[in-house]
A protein has these predicted regions:
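Terminal ABC-like ATPase head and other globular end-domains that cap long coiled-coil arms
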Residues: 1-129
Length: 129
């Protein structure tokens, strides 16, 4: 079933982004989301805005993988505004590992600094001031 696969894939992505803090994401039939840290269930209303944004990122990436047979480019526009530096780094590592073409639009320098620190792939930067 698509719902089970979506939960599994989104959980896998979220666990990687959060450094294993959240081991499972469950989206029920009413589209209510819950997180699990170990055996403890947490409603998403109890987590930070950054974690909520990471949940949505994981769900979007999982849905994209499940719905498209071919690899699609990933286009992100100020997606990481509420991420802390560690989770941003984890997310950029995940993107580099699993995605072939990623376009990141942002008004911040953090993404560029972390990508350079990690020496991830080929990068082209356009600065508009």
């Amino acid at each position: 079933e698509l719902g089970v696969k979506l939960n599994e894939k989104a959980s896998e992505i979220l666990s990687e982004i959060t450094g294993g803090k959240y081991t499972m994401l469950l989206i029920d039939e009413k589209l209510k989301m819950s997180l699990y840290t170990g055996q403890r269930k947490i409603g998403i209303e109890q987590v930070s805005r950054g974690t909520i944004e990471q949940i949505y990122f994981a769900v979007r990436m999982a849905a994209s993988e499940l719905l498209h047979e071919e690899e699609c480019p990933v286009i992100l526009d100020d997606t990481f505004v509420f991420y802390d530096d560690q989770r941003l780094e984890n997310t950029l590592k995940w993107l580099a590992k699993y995605k072939k073409q990623v376009l990141i639009f942002t008004c911040q320098k953090r993404e560029q600094q972390i990508l350079e620190k990690l020496e991830i792939g080929e990068k082209n930067y356009v600065n508009e001031n």
